Amino acid sequence: MAKHHPDLIFCRKQAGVAIGRLCEKCDGKCVICDSYVRPCTLVRICDECNYGSYQGRCVICGGPGVSDAYYCKECTIQEKDRDGCPKIVNLGSSKTDLFYERKKYGFKKR
């Protein structure tokens, strides 16, 4: 997700013991590069990103988590799994624009 949307911001605090989760839509993706190949290392997120209502949520989109998140083999070799907590903190401009467009034209989500 972050590879294709450069305006998304990662948390990047020191990772704790909590394991990152992925929703059905994001299941099987690498958290950093969005590839579906060779899952390798389990994703750890910081305690702040796993607190309260955020517990068990998808690391990428914030939906309800169904499976554990993994880094792919390439990201593990390049040591991108050691950069800190990979949880995406902001919405990004595309989702924000979509929200305001829907609000402007009066579309309701079913």
UniProtKB/Swiss-Prot annotation:
Keywords: Acetylation, Activator, DNA-binding, Metal-binding, mRNA processing, mRNA splicing, Nucleus, Phosphoprotein, RNA-binding, Spliceosome, Transcription, Transcription regulation, Zinc. Zn(2+) 2 binds at residues 23, 26, 58, 61. The modification Phosphoserine is found at residue 94. One of its GO terms (biological process) is stem cell differentiation. Its main location: nucleus. The modification N-acetylalanine is found at residue 2. Zn(2+) 3 binds at residues 30, 33, 72, 75. The record marks 100 as: Interaction with RNA. One of its GO terms (cellular component) is U2-type precatalytic spliceosome. One of its GO terms (molecular function) is DNA binding. Component of the 17S U2 SnRNP complex, a ribonucleoprotein complex that contains small nuclear RNA (snRNA) U2 and a number of specific proteins. Part of the SF3B subcomplex of the 17S U2 SnRNP complex. SF3B associates with the splicing subcomplex SF3A and a 12S RNA unit to form the U2 small nuclear ribonucleoproteins complex (U2 snRNP). Within the SF3B complex interacts directly with SF3B1 and SF3B3. Component of the minor spliceosome, which splices U12-type introns. Within this complex, interacts with CRIPT. Interacts (via N-terminus) with U2AF1 and SRSF5; acts to bridge the two. This is PHD finger-like domain-containing protein 5A.
